[in-house]
Amino acid sequence: MSNLLSVCDIKDEVLDILELAKNFKEGKMEEKPLAGKSLAMIFQKSSTRTRVSFDVGMYQLGGQALFLSSSELQMGRGEPIPDTAKVLSRFVDGIMIRAIEHDDVVELAKYSDVPVISGLTNLEHPCQALADMLTIQEHLGKLEGKKLCFVGDGNNVCNSLLLMAPLVGMDMSVACPEGYEPNEDIVNMAKKLAEEHNKEITISSDLKVALDNVDVVYTDVWVSMGDEKEAEQRQKDFAPYQVNSNLMSLANDGAIFMHCLPAIRGQEVSGEVIDGPQSVVFDEAENRLHAQKAVLYHFLK
């Protein structure tokens, strides 16, 4: 039995899952392949895209999704994670969890007898990265040979993109202020994968260096859930990294803009960019549904 806790868990299947997602989007798959299957969805953090896309995805696949807020579960009152995992495994065919701590998801998967899918942790967001690659493929025609630059905080989304880019044939750079680099272990793993696939990973505080020959400019909020106490300092540190028309001009002609949403216009991105012709953020949001249907099919079928 396999789980999706990290991009590394699907490093040999990424392209197959993306092909599945494309087929689901184009209506080429069998109808209701997960009829009679159920998915428990545990949420420790609030969500719009993750909750709706998994819920609708299971419905469209013929199965049922059960929304479980951690505050409503005994887990929220101190029941050990292993006990929760063992009990849920007796009732459902899979567990999706959106958690605060990555270690909690690892522990849940360790004791679960059914596949566990990460809907986001403080370390990674693999389903988002799959949706992102599907979106890039649609808009640029291919992934191989393209380059993505993540601008801003080296967060969970950035971590998953770093791991996935070389697997699909892309180079990747990260433009961030010093002190906000992505997780060191993730960067080392990404560089190892890049070496294996003859690709490049670059981390730089210099925008011109990071945005050289870039086809995709990607950003995310400067203040993630849990970082609110640092908000004022973060806004100062990230101000030069706002994705606006000047920054976009450093990328290639025809470059697209991406953001996993929710976005704060006037902070990490200007309104003219996110609402402009280069922005593909709502296609990207929609593709969460198709990518996750592929994930559910892959792990629960």
From Swiss-Prot:
Its EC number is 2.1.3.3. L-ornithine binds at residues 156, 220, 224-225. Gene3D superfamilies: Aspartate/ornithine carbamoyltransferase. It holds the Pfam family OTCace. One of its GO terms (cellular component) is cytoplasm. It is found in: Cytoplasm. GO terms for biological process: arginine biosynthetic process via ornithine; citrulline biosynthetic process; L-arginine biosynthetic process. It comes from the Archaea. It catalyses: carbamoyl phosphate + L-ornithine = L-citrulline + phosphate + H(+). Its main location: cytoplasm. The keyword Transferase applies. InterPro entries: Asp/Orn_carbamoyltranf_P-bd, Asp/Orn_carbamoylTrfase, Asp/Orn_carbamoylTrfase_sf, Asp_carbamoyltransf_Asp/Orn-bd, Orn/put_carbamltrans, OTCase_ArgI. GO terms for molecular function: amino acid binding; ornithine carbamoyltransferase activity. Keywords: Amino-acid biosynthesis, Arginine biosynthesis, Cytoplasm, Transferase. It is an enzyme of class 2 (transferase). Belongs to the aspartate/ornithine carbamoyltransferase superfamily. OTCase family. Reversibly catalyzes the transfer of the carbamoyl group from carbamoyl phosphate (CP) to the N(epsilon) atom of ornithine (ORN) to produce L-citrulline. PANTHER family: ORNITHINE CARBAMOYLTRANSFERASE, MITOCHONDRIAL (PTHR45753), ORNITHINE TRANSCARBAMYLASE, MITOCHONDRIAL (PTHR45753:SF3). This is Ornithine carbamoyltransferase. It comes from Methanobrevibacter smithii (strain ATCC 35061 / DSM 861 / OCM 144 / PS). The gene is argF.
